A protein has these predicted regions:
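Short, ordered coil/turn segments that flank beta-strands lining enzyme active or ligand-binding pockets
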Residues: 2
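Metal-dependent phosphodiesterase/phospholipase catalytic core, i.e.
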Residues: 5, 10-166
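Glycoside hydrolase catalytic-domain groove-lining segments
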Residues: 169
Length: 169
């Protein structure tokens, strides 16, 4: 977010999975997209999350649960950790966290250190140790090398690779 709070969202933009266009009309960038980093957490909490749509607003997965009439918020990473911890306590299970650092190079170009923000939350919830239930994954190899070399996060790390990279497409 604009105020440096890590949120749980698949994309760095909001228009395909929220009602951002109807709430914050005119806040898109020149490319027509609404970037999460341009909104404070308070603003993002005003949005309703929904199933993915295409740019025309048509459901990408029309047979999935629509959530019509329900206000689903975009959670912060801290809220998600609290949810997982509460479920684990209630069920006696050990569900973990699989965190993707989404486009850290983009965030860096915007003056934000995504990795540092995520580390701060993980530190608050004692998730930095050698714990296989907390995983960090990323497409950016430079960021994953930083995760390894700084030695702060000791859990598993996963290098993501695009199909185009593997197949040379």
């Amino acid at each position: 977010t604009a105020d440096g709070i890590p949120i749980v969202l698949h994309d760095v933009t909001l228009e395909l999975t929220t009602n951002v266009e109807s709430i914050f009309e005119g806040r898109q960038r020149d490319d027509g997209l609404f970037y999460a980093i341009d909104f404070t957490l308070a603003e993002i909490k005003r949005l309703t999350a929904h199933e993915r749509t295409d740019l025309s607003g048509k459901a990408v997965f029309p047979d999935r649960y629509s959530g019509d009439g329900v206000h689903f918020e975009i959670p912060t990473l801290a809220e998600e950790i609290e949810l997982v911890d509460a479920l684990n306590a209630k069920t006696g299970k050990c569900a973990g966290l699989y965190i993707e650092l989404k486009r850290p190079e983009f965030h860096e170009s915007e003056g934000a250190d995504l990795y540092a923000s995520v580390l701060q939350v993980l530190r608050e919830y004692d998730r930095l140790g050698d714990n296989p239930e907390t995983v960090i994954q990323c497409f950016d190899p430079v960021t994953l090398k930083r995760v390894q070399s700084d030695g702060i996060f000791k859990g598993p790390r996963v290098q993501l690779i695009l199909t185009e990279t593997i197949l040379g497409m």
